[in-house]
Design a protein with these regions (language model features):
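Structural motif corresponding to the intra-repeat A-B loop/turn of tetratricopeptide repeats
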Residues: 72, 161, 300-302
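Conserved, well-structured interaction surfaces
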Residues: 2-76, 98, 102-104, 123, ...
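Long, intrinsically disordered, low-complexity segments
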Residues: 278, 282, 328-391
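Hydrophobic-face positions in mid-chain alpha helices that act as interaction patches
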Residues: 144, 165-288, 368-391
Length: 391
């Protein structure tokens, strides 16, 4: 697509690429500044809010600060496995005119975990756990950084840090809560898109109410008189078949059947199309499927790992006969299969790129240019380097 042509080819110093990268950096740190203002306001005015509400707002703020910094780290810092001790990004934890120094990858992850631990403590009596919301604003907890979203993010962060024990602990807590049931086939396998659940709504632990989704999907995922295929984010038919292992599993995967629409000789991903009012403006950030993949990767035994892995695939249209068997599955084969599921499950969401970065993959399939691991790290904007004395 036009705006992302150079990013798609990892040309980060092109003006169009720099515009996108600078916007990500500036907007996310602006959001962090607003979170810090909120936290300072809560600290300076204790007792104005009811005690239970104050804890929830404060807990959500700590969680959001951690979430924003973690994604900045995944974009602008090296992976933990390739550069734990290398300088990455500033972790801004207070309102100050002073320049925040860069922290290492490991230090950022420690700060993220510290904020998430504070959030989990403050959200202990979250309405998502008690079932009692004192105000309407505190309802519909999947639109807020709720307690289980904190645990899910902790699972993601700990795995990024290669701490599989704590990653498994947090992932299984979310799984065992039974708060996020698998989507029913009838919600996905609809005859038209008018009432199709493209995001598997019941499985969403945390999501955005993104009122710009229609504009985004109309711009990048739908063809019109003024929007040709050359401007769209499209997938070649053979690449779609490869991603979903069509020759091996016969195209039974719901994500293969119901996530795409043909346009000319290509396909576009449709899961975020704004068709049904029941699912409008909903953009998933954390889902129960990721917890199953994390549990599969971190489980203490192969039997347990395969139970998590096969359960996920059975709820995506796979037959029990397609289950991976313990006697036929090496550790390497299981890890490869987990990577393939990340690619299928989070297509169009970016999580598979971060999976490849976390696991230090030397190559990426279907890229337009020869790949280098250097492409995993976005450049910090020049303005930040200049005025932050980062050079």
């Amino acid at each position: 697509a036009g705006t992302y042509y150079y990013l798609h080819r990892f040309v980060y110093d092109n003006p169009k690429s720099e515009e996108v990268i600078n916007s990500i950096w500036n907007n996310m740190y602006n959001a962090i500044a607003n979170v810090n203002i909120l936290l300072q306001g809560i600290e300076d005015h204790r007792g104005i809010l009811a005690a239970d509400e104050e804890k929830i707002y404060e807990g959500e703020a700590y969680a959001l600060r951690a979430f924003l910094h973690f994604d900045l780290l995944r974009l602008f810092g090296k992976s933990y496995v390739s550069g734990a001790g290398e300088k990455a990004i500033p972790y801004v934890s207070k309102i100050s005119k002073e320049i925040t120094p860069l922290s290492t990858v490991s230090e950022v992850l420690d700060s993220v975990i510290t904020d998430l631990e504070k959030a989990a403590f403050l959200l202990e009596n979250d309405p998502v756990r008690t079932g009692e919301a004192t105000t309407s604003f505190l309802g519909t907890r999947s639109f807020h950084f709720n307690y289980y979203a904190v645990r899910a993010l902790m699972a993601r962060v700990y795995l990024y840090k290669n701490d599989k024990v704590n990653a498994l602990k947090n992932a299984t807590e979310v799984i065992l809560s039974h708060k996020y049931p698998w989507v029913e086939k009838g919600q996905v396998a609809t005859t038209t898109r008018d009432n199709r659940d493209g995001i598997f709504l019941t499985e969403c632990i945390l999501m955005l109410n993104n009122t710009r989704l229609e504009t985004i999907t109309e711009t990048y995922l739908k063809k019109s008189e003024n929007n040709t295929v050359g401007n769209l984010l499209v997938t070649q038919a053979e690449v779609r078949d490869e991603i979903f292992e069509n020759t091996l599993y016969g195209g039974s995967d719901w994500r293969y059947i119901y996530y795409f629409e043909p346009i000319d000789s290509y396909y576009v991903n449709t899961k975020l199309w704004q068709v049904s009012s029941s699912y409008n403006n909903r953009q998933p950030l954390l889902r129960i499927s990721e917890m199953y993949l994390i549990a599969a990767e971190c489980a203490g035994s192969k039997k347990e790992a395969l139970e998590y892995f096969n359960t996920l695939r059975q709820h995506r249209g796979f037959e029990v006969t397609d289950d991976l068997k313990e006697e036929d599955t090496t550790d390497e084969k299981l890890q490869t299969a987990i990577g393939k599921e990340y690619r299928k499950e989070f297509i169009g969401e970016g999580q598979w790129f971060f999976y490849c970065k976390r696991t230090d993959q030397a190559t990426l399939p279907n890229v337009q240019v020869p790949f280098s691991k250097a492409y995993y790290v976005l450049p910090i904007p020049d303005q930040e380097l200049e005025y932050g004395n980062r050079n």
